[in-house]
Amino acid sequence: MTDAIRPLIAGNWKMNGLKASAAEFDAMLNGAADVATKADLLVCPPATLIAAFADKARGKKVAVGAQDCHPKASGAHTGDIAAEMLANAGATAIIVGHSERRADHGEGDALVRQKAEAAWRAGVTAIVCIGETQAQRDAGQTLDILRGQLDGSLPDGSTAANLVVAYEPVWAIGTGLTPTVQDVEQIHGFIREFLTSRFSVDGAKMRILYGGSVKPSNAAELMAVKNVNGALVGGASLKAADFLAIAKGCP
């Protein structure tokens, strides 16, 4: 944790959730008041549920976000969704550059940067994801990979108000594996140094989230690490009890 930076616990539902999932979201809304003093809460459901969830969340302690956007505001892009459309549906933040988008759809740093700028254009926060693969880690390339992703994916003009960085080691996502606390501290410290060097005072205030098999049993330990300002939670965010328990793990 970093003094004076309010933690953010963001849930990425990925390609999960139908109308019936509103019951879990309702439970999150009902329990949010108990953790509101510890952290901000954000849930990013599939695009099909954003409007319904945003309506439910109005005036409550849980914000609603999106998992991706197209860089353009409109046009002949069948199946894509503009940041403006997501904001219009009620999203207040958009995840961009998630490793699954980078791997499954071949998204590179330049496109991720454009998507972050699109989020800003729509008046919402960009959550930019970075992370190394197992092969890159084994080759000792972690910091070089992260430096390249940070340099290429973060737009000029990034501030603590419009951008969040999420570090997700690709090898830890959905595997049950997590880096050691020492590894997390080293990498988040490296990210903080990069952000402060490039964005000065704002870089020192930006939230840096940890993601990758975050669960109630390890949340408190991870959230206590210096320069960890919250979590990007995958599978555990699908259950209200787990999601809220992770938030309770914040100092």
Curated annotation (Swiss-Prot):
Subcellular compartments: Cytoplasm
CC terms in the record's Gene Ontology section: cytosol
Signal peptide (UniProt feature, chain positions): none
Keyword annotations: Cytoplasm, Gluconeogenesis, Glycolysis, Isomerase
Active-site residues per Swiss-Prot or TrEMBL entry: 98 (electrophile), 168 (proton acceptor)
Stored CDD domains: TIM
EC number: 5.3.1.1
One BP term from GO: glycolytic process
Alphabetized NCBIfam families for the sequence: tim (TIGR00419)
Name of the protein in its database record: Triosephosphate isomerase
Gene that encodes the chain: tpiA
